[in-house]
Structure formats: C-alpha cells, structure tokens
Design a protein with these regions (language model features):
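Gly/Ser/Thr-rich loops at beta-strand to alpha-helix junctions
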Residues: 90-91, 149-156, 179-182, 255, ...
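Glycine-rich phosphate/diphosphate-binding loops that line cofactor/substrate pockets in enzymes
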Residues: 129-145, 240, 275-280
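Active-site histidine-anchored catalytic micro-motif
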Residues: 166, 171-216, 285
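C-terminal functional extensions of proteins
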Residues: 197-198, 203-247, 252-283, 288-367
Length: 367
C-alpha cells in the first residue's frame, strides 16, 4: 500500500514543541507520564525536526540516547538515567505524532491507536493470488519473511508444503513452540504425530512416540546434530537446518521434554523472537494464538526500506477460528489480514498459486 507522509507544514506540527524527555528513575522503571508506543509510524520532534525512532513496536517507550538517536525500547531494557519520552497526546501537540492514516491518506474520524477494533469473518473470500504475489515480491526483493507456526502445521498435510516454502526461499525465519518441532521430528522418525498416522489413525503404543522422538534429539545434543547424524531425515526442522534458516523455539508451562533447542526463559525467548521481528519485511502467522499475538506485539505496522521509503508490513494471520484472528487484531496488530481457514488447506492452496506464478514466469520451483 502507498505510504502518505504527515504534512509537517500544518501549524500544529510546524510550530509545535519538541518532545519532552525525562530520565528513568531506576532500571526497568519509567518516569510518570511516559509515552506508550504503538506499532504505527511515529515521530518525535527533537531539535525542531520530526524524527522516527528505530526498531518500532507497540507497548514500549521512546528513548533518546547519548548520540541523540531515538530508539524504541521495552520497559525492562530501560536503564536508570535513560531519557524517556513523556506525553499522552498523539497528535503532535506534545512533540509526539502517531501517524494513524499513513496508509489510507484520509483523515480518520478517530485516529488514535486502539485495541478491540477488529472486523473478521470466515465469509470473506481469500485472495490467494494476492498472497502469492506478496510472497514472490518478498523473495524477489531479498526480503525477510518471518513465519510463526503452530502445531497444526505438523498434524496436517501442511508439513510438506512448509518444507517446500523453506526449500524455495520463501522463509526468512521460523518462530514456533516446542510442540511444532516435536511433532515434526516425530513424523520424521516414526511417521506419526502424537501417535497418529497421516490418515488420523492411532497406532499401538503411539502415545509415547513424541517422547521417544524428544529423547533421540536430546541424545544427539540438538536438532542440528540430529539432522547431521541422520536421526532426522526429513520435515520442517530438517529443511530449516539444511537451508541454514534460523528458527526460535519458545517453551511453555506444558512442554514435554523439551527439545534441547527450546528457550525456556520467557524473557530470553522474547529477545530471540524480537531479533527476527525487527528484520521482518512480511509475517505469516499460522495456527497459533499465543505465538501470533506475541509476535504481532513485536512487529511494527510498516517497513522502512534502506532508501528511507516506507511501506506497510504485510501480516497474514491464518486460523480455523475467527476468535484467534480477531484477538490478534484486537491486541493492536491492525495491519493483519485475517484468513479464517485450516492450516492444511491454506498452505496447499497457497503453494499451488505460487507454483503457478513461477511456471508462468518460466522459473519453476527447484524442488
């Protein structure tokens, strides 16, 4: 979508005050009246000039460092004495502007960043052609598509399609939980997920297959080592390791094992996920409520290109439940395009559309 920059010649913005910065009173403690950031294009006036903070995201603060560079920082990363922007107004009157109409070009009746404002329906048609074009554009420009995946990807036949997207250069990084990797690895070693075959039939003693898969990987030392020694021979994790695509596996309170690569410290996991969210030029969130919302909170609604131009960050959220897609948007990820369908259908149909476009270009998929 086209980016419409703010009109800084407007009287309020042309003659308004600089943003005010107040030192943080202690590590991880913010000054009273701190400005709570959004994921929309945001500007702070410093030295009479409107500037955008680096590494934007919602639910954080704007910090002016010793070199007068603006950064977006999480509360827990703020140190005593850091200069933190204060102010509640988002229209520039306090030196901070949230540009809510950046991609509409039209004045909004109520331009403030808000939660709980979604419109999602399973009756909306899915434009797979557009989604395929977005993926191809990202690959062509050397972008960094971040995929956030839930366990349904492994339970369904979507597993093979995910492997195809990895092998053909459409995945920059994958963020997921322990279960995604466990089910995928179980499928590689035993041909089942949670003891079920690809046809959904239970196998004798299959209830323990995922534990045996975890044990084999722990014996190898890591997922990469299990790929190298032949324990894992196919699947999503095998494709990621083979293609040297980074992944972050985040633990939860209910995890079995977990696998040795899983990050069990929530704050360390946040930092690991954030490192990829900062680089994301597109996000595809499939069949996972918690990981989708967590990642959505880390993503800006826009991408700043190397030449300084700005475009909307395409964010696709796929789930069989309208509730999940609505909740993501209600938590502030307004730019998310909701697709209410199951993971298997979405992945397979999207792959067919991408393959068709590649064939029309005369550059068929390599695998």
């Amino acid at each position: 979508m086209t980016f419409y920059p703010p009109d800084f010649t407007r009287p309020l913005l042309a003659t308004g005050p600089d943003a005010r910065f107040v030192p943080a009173p202690a590590d991880g403690v913010l000054p009273d009246g701190f400005f709570s950031s959004t994921n929309l294009p945001t500007y702070a006036r410093v030295g009479g000039k409107w500037r955008m903070p680096r590494e934007p995201r919602m639910d954080s603060v704007i910090v002016l460092d010793d070199h007068d560079v603006l950064w977006t920082r999480e509360m827990r990363r703020v140190k005593r004495g850091d200069r933190v922007a204060v102010g509640l107004a988002e229209d520039g009157r306090e030196g901070i502007l949230v540009h809510a109409t950046a991609f509409t070009g039209e004045p909004a009746a109520d331009p403030e960043f808000k939660f709980m404002a979604s419109e999602v329906s399973r009756e909306k048609p899915i434009d797979y052609s557009l989604l395929a074009d977005l993926l191809l554009e990202e690959r062509d420009r050397g972008g960094y598509p971040v995929w956030v995946c839930g366990p349904a990807l492994g339970h369904s036949r979507a597993r093979n399609d995910m492997v195809w997207f990895i092998q053909n250069g459409f995945v920059g990084a994958m963020l997921a939980g322990n279960a995604v990797a466990v089910h995928d690895i179980e499928a590689s070693i035993f041909g089942t997920t949670l003891g079920m075959t690809g046809q959904g039939e239970a196998t004798s003693g299959g209830h323990g297959a995922h534990m045996r898969a975890i044990n084999k990987v722990r014996s190898s030392g890591s997922i990469a080592s299990a790929v190298a020694d032949g324990t894992i021979t196919d699947g999503i994790m095998h494709a990621l390791v083979t293609a040297k695509i980074p992944f972050v596996l985040t633990g939860s309170i209910r995890d079995d094992g977990p696998l040795p690569d899983v990050i069990t410290d929530a704050l360390v996991a946040q930092d690991a996920m954030r490192a990829h969210a900062i680089k994301a030029t597109m996000a595809i969130l499939i069949a996972t409520a918690l990981h989708a919302i967590a990642t959505g909170n880390m993503l800006p609604a826009f991408v700043t290109e190397e030449d300084g131009s700005i475009r909307e960050l395409a964010t696709i959220c796929v789930d069989s439940a309208e509730f999940v897609v609505s909740k993501l948007k209600d938590r502030g990820t307004h730019q998310a395009f909701g697709v209410v369908t199951n993971a298997q259908d979405f992945m397979h149909i999207l792959r067919l559309y991408v393959e068709r476009e590649l064939d029309q270009r005369g550059t068929p998929a390599t695998t």
